[in-house]
């Protein structure tokens, strides 16, 4: 019953944002009118809470943003900012934004992808796509260590000989996505999988570790990769575009509250892929709430200290 209630809540929020209606509780009287979006992933929620805590701290409590959690896609996040229901996103990813929201071709060069994304959001939407936190959460195919050794798997191209043998699980949103999804993958690598199922990406790691799947498409920063001793296969054809993660805000809100720009900028380039993987692990495997993971990390690494202290 709890899962059903959660699903209904997420669905209601997503539909409300998509319809362009204001979300309940997000009038100018709450959080000084500042709301931060996050998606369903643990990672998105952790860094979004980091953004919230940094803004609260550096505004000396004058700004207390509210959170809009569990949005189902980057497009829904974008619509929330377009409608004015939110002003900040904790995590937006270059690869997703280019091919999804901006409807551009995938770009394999991380620097070019970031520049294109930043320029497009600035010019077309008057929004700021910041430089990266420092981690790239791209897609990658992965297997158990036993499978990698048994079939001598190191690269994605090595899978070509086992397309009908492996049970494969992939992210639901990736399965039909244009640009960098499964249709384009088949064209780039020249093969398709005979037994492939689309599923919630949070489920693929355990399914892989228990043998329900032989091969899965996952996120490179997921903490369950080391937890289950999974082997990430090299994307040898460089099909998957970079998914460098960055904070995101409207120019209107950072012009009105320059301290928001200061707070978000302090996190740029400070979180590595390995660090993010460990933070995800703390929440996904140790059961610590994303908000607490975020707060403990910021305190431990002195984000709340002024420069020069």
Describe the function of each predicted region.
Residues 1-8:
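Bacterial N-terminal signal peptides that target proteins for export
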Residues 17-20:
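C-terminal motif of bacterial Sec signal peptides marking the signal peptidase cleavage site
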Residues 22-25:
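Bacterial signal peptide processing site
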Residues 31-71, 134-205, 288-292:
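Bilobed "Venus flytrap"/periplasmic-binding protein-like clamshell domains
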Residues 43, 177, 188-191, 265-309:
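An extracytoplasmic/periplasmic, membrane-proximal ligand-sensing/linker region
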Residues 54, 75-86, 102-104, 183-188, ...:
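Short helices/loops that flank or line small-molecule/ion binding pockets
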Residues 100-109, 115-130, 212, 224-238:
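Ligand-binding "clamshell"
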Residues 138-149, 244-257:
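A bilobed periplasmic-binding-protein/Venus flytrap-type ligand-binding module shared by bacterial periplasmic
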């Amino acid at each position: 019953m709890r899962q059903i209630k959660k699903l209904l809540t997420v669905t209601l929020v997503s539909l409300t944002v998509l319809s362009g209606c204001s979300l309940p509780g997000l009038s100018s009287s709450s959080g000084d009118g500042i709301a931060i979006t996050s998606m369903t992933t643990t990672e998105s929620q952790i860094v979004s809470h980091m953004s919230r805590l940094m803004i609260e701290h550096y505004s000396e409590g004058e700004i207390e943003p509210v959170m809009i959690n569990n949005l189902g896609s980057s497009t829904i996040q974008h619509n929330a900012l377009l409608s004015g229901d939110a002003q900040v996103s904790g995590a937006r990813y270059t690869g997703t934004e280019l091919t999804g929201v901006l409807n551009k071709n995938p770009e394999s060069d991380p620097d070019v992808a970031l520049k294109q994304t930043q320029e497009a959001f600035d010019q077309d939407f008057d929004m700021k796509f910041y430089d990266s936190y420092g981690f790239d959460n791209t897609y990658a195919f992965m297997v158990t260590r036993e499978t990698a050794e048994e079939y001598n798997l190191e690269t994605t191209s090595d899978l070509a000989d086992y397309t009908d043998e492996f049970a494969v699980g992939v992210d639901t949103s990736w399965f039909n996505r244009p640009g960098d999804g499964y249709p384009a993958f088949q064209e780039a690598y020249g093969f398709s999988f005979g037994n492939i199922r689309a599923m919630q990406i949070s489920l693929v790691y355990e399914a892989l570790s228990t043998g329900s799947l032989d091969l899965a498409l996952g996120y490179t920063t997921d903490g369950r990769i080391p937890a289950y001793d999974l082997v990430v296969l090299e994307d040898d054809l460089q099909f998957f575009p970079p998914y460098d993660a960055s904070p995101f805000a409207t120019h209107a809100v950072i012009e009105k509250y320059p301290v928001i720009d200061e707070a978000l900028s302090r996190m740029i380039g400070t979180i590595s892929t390995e660090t993010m993987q460990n933070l995800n692990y703390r929440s996904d495997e140790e059961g610590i709430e994303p908000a607490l993971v975020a707060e403990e990390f910021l305190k431990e690494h002195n984000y709340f200290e002024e420069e020069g202290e």
